[in-house]
Amino acid sequence: MGGLRLLAVALTCSCWWPQGGQGKTLRGSFSSAAARDAQGQSIGHFEFHGDHALLCVRINNVAVAVGKEAKLYLFQAQEWLKLLESSPGYSCSERLARAQLTVTVTQTEHNLTVSQLPAPQTWRVFYADKFTCRDDSESPQGEEIPFEMVLLNPDAEGNPLDHFSARESGLHEFFFLLVLVYFVTACIYAQSLWQAMKKGGPMHTILKVLTTALLLQAASALANYIHLSRYSRDGLGVPLIGSLAEVFDIASQIQMLYLLLSLCMGWTIVRMKKSQSRPLQWDSTPASTGIAVFIVITQSILLLWEQFEDTSHHSAHSHRSLAGLLLIVLRICLALSLGCGLYQVITVERSALKREFYITFAKGCILWFLCQPALACIAVAFNDYQRDKLITVGVILCQAVAMVILYRLFLSHSLYWEVSSLSSVTLPLTISSAHRGRPHF
């Protein structure tokens, strides 16, 4: 399956190119033409919280700003939506006049303290000047005004030094703890796992694929931590490393998807075609391989489509676009189909050992596929700024638990078969000789 691996890497790299404009230190230019075309140039948005949040804007060309009567307008996101949806609509000047906060840009640096309600709220920042609401057709003249804008929330001591918005707060600490857990776990179990893999046996290939997926998830957590550590200092982070974190995560998802599908499809198809006395194998049959490859390619295409459709670049796990909804539907369908297939295998299986094996495997599969749809439904009951964090943290933890379940399952059975010196023909899972010699995704 080397070609499948190359396809996965190509798709994930193409859809997760470094994203710009995601930091809370914003750099750009105030443009009279852009402000006039849109009746207010959108600069950015931020989830402020606390009583001492700060907006700091710096410019160099003060004379041009004064000549243009440059101003910044801050709207609460909900109020801004009401203005856009109001009927009859407000004129340009009436809309700007309803801004909750206004800053007249007349100095090199302006600091605006945002007094906030107890609950965090999203604020949108717009630029406008004397040319923005004019009715004449003459194009606005004059230079653009380069700016740097820093958006800060209060830290634990109440000082406006936190670059993280309410939507992102706590993720830095979460990824630090996650990386720490991965490191400690590796120190404890890496040697024994390596020895188990060196011994070979019927679980060898599965453990290799599962370990690769786990290493990709650990690399994603480390890249996220590095990006957020830099982000906490300058509000920009390292977009390339942040994008690599998503690449690693998606590659891990595809790796696990192919593993789970290959195992389950192989078992169910072989069960239908062979007598029940024959062992269930991870056979490289055209049917099982074709189904797995088709679903993996489908998920990869949906992930690529989602990145082009979701311009707001939310968390990779919080699917908000049409493609994201299709991904959720795909996961639900996979969980149901694999669950039904395994249920059929379990009901006709006479061996208690095999039944226990399949039941535990089914639990890991269902948890892996259904955690994201379930958390997405639960997140509806929470505030908007809490949803991305809930889904991101919940999916990572649930999938980690699913991988632990699968690791315990395969390692325990590998040890049992080794100690018992059972023939591979009697095992509930073997790998055919033709399949063993092939590289697996």
Curated annotation (Swiss-Prot):
Chief subcellular location: membrane
Localization terms from the record: Membrane
Membrane topology: Multi-pass membrane protein
Glycosylation sites: 111
Pfam family name, one: GPR180-TMEM145_TM
Record-linked InterPro entries: GPR180-like_N, GPR180/TMEM145, GPR180/TMEM145_TM
Transmembrane segments: 174-194, 206-226, 250-270, 285-305, 322-342, 361-381, 390-410
BP-aspect Gene Ontology terms: fat cell differentiation; G protein-coupled receptor signaling pathway; gene expression; generation of precursor metabolites and energy; lipid metabolic process; response to food; response to pheromone
Keyword terms, alphabetized: Glycoprotein, Membrane, Signal, Transmembrane, Transmembrane helix
Record keyword Signal present: yes
GO cellular component, one term: membrane
Keyword Glycoprotein attributed: yes
Record protein name field: Integral membrane protein GPR180
Record organism: Mus musculus
Species lineage: Eukaryota, Metazoa, Chordata, Craniata, Vertebrata
